Amino acid sequence: MLFSFSLFHKTTLGISLGSSNTYIARHGKGIVLGEPSVVATDIYNEKVVAIGDKAKKMIGRAPETISVDRPISGGIISDFDKTVAMLCQYVSRVVQTRIGITSAIVVPAAASSVERRSMRDMAKAAYGSRVVPVDEPIAAALGCGLDVFSGRGHIIVDIGGGTAEIAVISLGGIVASRSVRMAGDMFDQAIIAFIKRKYNLLIGERTAEQIKIEIGSAYPM
């Protein structure tokens, strides 16, 4: 899919829905929201109890009556209604009105036409705006300040929570790409397994993630 800078330049919001975290950026302001992609609901009436960081803190601690889920899997919607509820709340935090909003929403390069349409439908249901899909490697390159329209090829490796995408981009498009379901979440599980095997100690996902960030980051986070 060829990237359209003219459409992208007119967008109000940039939205990245990841398996682990959701980020929203505003034109001219940069990232204005970063929250976990987690939703907690009451299993009896399906009412949303908590979203984002509050919901993430409930993982492994919630009673049986509360279901804590990640509605995004591998960059693709796995629970439409919960994703709508989550994104609706997030968007309302960063804009006063949803009228006239145009958003650029990140989608995996390997996403099918059905998956892309589902992402657009979800965004429209959440805040009723025009949606411009942007392939994940292109969005990552733009975020790094690379000139995606130059004839010089760039290799982009984007490791998220549920998937890692590797792509070669040039002249505003993706020349070749590969997506693998081996990323940050799997790293966390490997850390949990190692600590249990090495020290016979059981740690949770939040602790494993913190270990990964503190030890595995090339730059302080």
Region spans (language model):
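Nucleotide/phosphate-binding catalytic cleft detector across ATP-hydrolyzing
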Residues: M1-I159, A167-M221
